[in-house]
Structure formats: structure tokens, C-alpha cells
Amino acid sequence: MIAVTTPEILPLLHPLIGQLATAILSHWENYLDLSPFELPEGLGYVEGRLEGEKLIIENRCYQTPQFRKMHLELAKLGNGLDILHCVMFPRPEYPLPMFGCDIVSGKAGISAAIVDLSPTSGDKTLPSAYNQALAALPGADFAQARDLPPWGHIFSQYCLFIRPETAAEERQFLQRVTDFLTIHCKCARESQPLSGEEARIYLQGQRDYCSQQQKNDKTRRVLEKAFGWEWAERYMTGVLFDLPD
């Protein structure tokens, strides 16, 4: 088991992003048996320029017996844009959903915050243990819900996509993310591997999830402007949403 390391750019980011990154890394370290995950060469820490402003991307990646990759990305563009992106990719033989969380913060505050446990089963439903635990969580009340993208069918009924308007809503979102993480890590530790056709069904579910996420045009456009098309394609398909074998 290894210890997580604190990202260098963490103090430069929006406070909620810092709190979420710390909570994510803490859950991984406390609940799971971590080992290193090697990213493609040169993609762990990246600097570039976009429209005259400095762009920094810093990644943390680990793996466990249940997860083939657990990825936390933090990014900062000048003084106007902070981003957190996190996905936990199960090993295909484990019948687990995809944990995903994203936050975008601009000069006017946080414009988007999303968290979900997205199903990978053949019928696109969550395991019963997840449904029971998620249904038991306190209700979440936010003033401004966001619309899901056209490919949003990959998300579960528990997906939370909002624009927090107050510090209280930011704290409530942070609590919801930590609740999702706790449920996910506990269920993962108790999960038993599948074999044969069942495992192939979950493998296809994860491929569908990654394929749909690769359609995120906003992310791709930013990367293309800063680093070029070839680099953006390599990053989108090799780091953000690589397809499992």
C-alpha cells in the first residue's frame, strides 16, 4: 500500500476544489489498497498556454484490486478557470458503477458541479447495495439545477448536476460527494469478481461510458487550442477516458 501525495497546484485552486480533492484522496487512502498507476509519458504534469494565459494540468492516478484506474485531474487556466475532474474506473470483472465528479470554477464562482455513480450493468441499473445506500441519504436541495448533456443517459437517477449559489450549497455538495465516495469504497471492498459472460457485460458498460464521455466537445476544444489536435486526442483517449481492454 502506498500513501497519496498532495498535488502541487492545490493551494492555487478554488477552496471547494481543494476540499473535494483532499476528500477524494483521503477516501482512497483510508478505504482502499492503493498501488501506483503509470500514466503515458509526459502526461502526469503538463503546462501550456491558451489565449495568452498559462494552463497547468496535474494528475494523480492509482489502482487497486477493484479499480484498474482512479484518476484525479486538477487544472488551472490563468486566474479565471479552475477545474477538478475525477473518475474511478472499475476492473471489468467487478460489478461496480463509475464514480465521476467534475467542478468548473470561473471568476464569478462555480459554474458547474456534478457527481454520480453511473451504472455499467447490462440493464443500466445500479446494484441493490448502492440503491439502498443512496436512497437512504438525506434529500439534497439546490436552487439551480443544470441540464445534462445530450449523452447524459449514461448517468444514474442519483446524478447531481448543479450550480451552487451559496457557501451552504457548496458545503452540501461536498457532503454529497463524500457520501457517494464512502458508499462506493465500502461496496467495492465487499464486491466479488465475476467471470465469463457477466464480466464481459460490465466491460461493455464501461466502454459505453468512456465512449460517451469522449464526446465532451468543451473539454476537447480547450485541449486542442492549448496543445493541438493530436495531443488532445491522445489525452482524451489515453488519460481521461481510456477504453479498457
Swiss-Prot record:
Signal peptide: none annotated. GO terms for molecular function: cobalt ion binding; phycocyanobilin:ferredoxin oxidoreductase activity. Belongs to the HY2 family. One of its GO terms (biological process) is phytochromobilin biosynthetic process. It catalyses: (2R,3Z)-phycocyanobilin + 4 oxidized [2Fe-2S]-[ferredoxin] = biliverdin IXalpha + 4 reduced [2Fe-2S]-[ferredoxin] + 4 H(+). Pfam families: Fe_bilin_red (PF05996). Its EC number is 1.3.7.5. Keywords: Oxidoreductase. It comes from the Bacteria. Catalyzes the four-electron reduction of biliverdin IX-alpha (2-electron reduction at both the A and D rings); the reaction proceeds via an isolatable 2-electron intermediate, 181,182-dihydrobiliverdin. PANTHER family: PHYTOCHROMOBILIN:FERREDOXIN OXIDOREDUCTASE, CHLOROPLASTIC. It is an enzyme of class 1 (oxidoreductase). This is Phycocyanobilin:ferredoxin oxidoreductase. It comes from Microcystis aeruginosa (strain NIES-843 / IAM M-2473). The gene is pcyA.
